[in-house]
C-alpha cells in the first residue's frame, strides 16, 4: 500500500513539473529578402506588424520577441524569403 501511495505522489509531482513548464510552441524568425530578421520595436504579444509579416510567410500568428518578429509553428522547412 505504501509503495502505491509513493508511486502516486511521484507521478503527481512529475505531472505538475510538466504543466509548470508547459509545451514550447515551435517557431522561427522569418527572413526578409536580404536574409535578415524583421525588426520590431514594441515587444508584446499582439504586435500587428509581426502578425502581418508572419501571414505573408504563411503562418497564422506571430509576435515581437527580443525586438524581432517571431512566427509560431514556423519551421526551417517553411523558411523562405518574400
Curated annotation (Swiss-Prot):
Disulfide bonds: 40-64, 50-69, 54-71
Domain of life assignment: Eukaryota
One of the record's GO molecular function terms: ion channel inhibitor activity
PROSITE patterns linked to this entry: LCN_CSAB (PS51863)
UniProt keyword Flavoprotein present: no
Keywords: Disulfide bond, Ion channel impairing toxin, Neurotoxin, Secreted, Signal, Toxin, Voltage-gated sodium channel impairing toxin
Domain LCN-type CS-alpha/beta: 25-82
Any one Pfam family match given in the protein's UniProt record, by short name: Toxin_3
Tissue-by-tissue expression: Expressed by the venom gland.
Record's GO cellular component terms: extracellular region
Subcellular location: Secreted
CDD domains attached to this UniProt entry: neurotoxins_LC_scorpion
Range of residues in the leader sequence: 1-22
Miscellaneous notes: Negative results: is totally devoid of toxicity when intracerebroventricularly injected into mice and does not compete with radiolabeled voltage-gated potassium and sodium channel toxins in binding experiments on rat brain synaptosomes.
Domain observations: Has the structural arrangement of an alpha-helix connected to antiparallel beta-sheets by disulfide bonds (CS-alpha/beta).
Family indicated by similarity: Belongs to the long (3 C-C) scorpion toxin superfamily. Sodium channel inhibitor family. Beta subfamily.
Function: Shifts the voltage of activation of para/tipE voltage-dependent sodium channels (Nav) toward more negative potentials.
Name this protein carries in UniProt: Beta-insect toxin AaBTxL1
Taxon lineage: Eukaryota, Metazoa, Ecdysozoa, Arthropoda, Chelicerata
Amino acid at each position: 500500500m505504501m509503495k502505491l501511495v509513493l508511486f502516486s505522489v511521484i507521478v503527481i509531482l512529475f505531472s505538475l513539473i510538466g504543466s509548470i513548464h508547459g509545451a514550447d510552441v515551435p517557431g522561427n524568425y522569418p527572413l526578409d529578402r536580404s536574409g535578415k530578421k524583421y525588426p520590431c520595436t514594441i515587444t508584446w504579444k499582439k504586435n500587428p506588424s509581426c502578425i502581418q509579416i508572419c501571414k505573408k510567410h504563411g503562418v497564422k500568428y506571430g509576435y515581437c520577441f527580443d525586438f524581432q518578429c517571431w512566427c509560431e509553428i514556423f519551421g526551417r522547412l517553411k523558411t523562405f524569403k518574400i
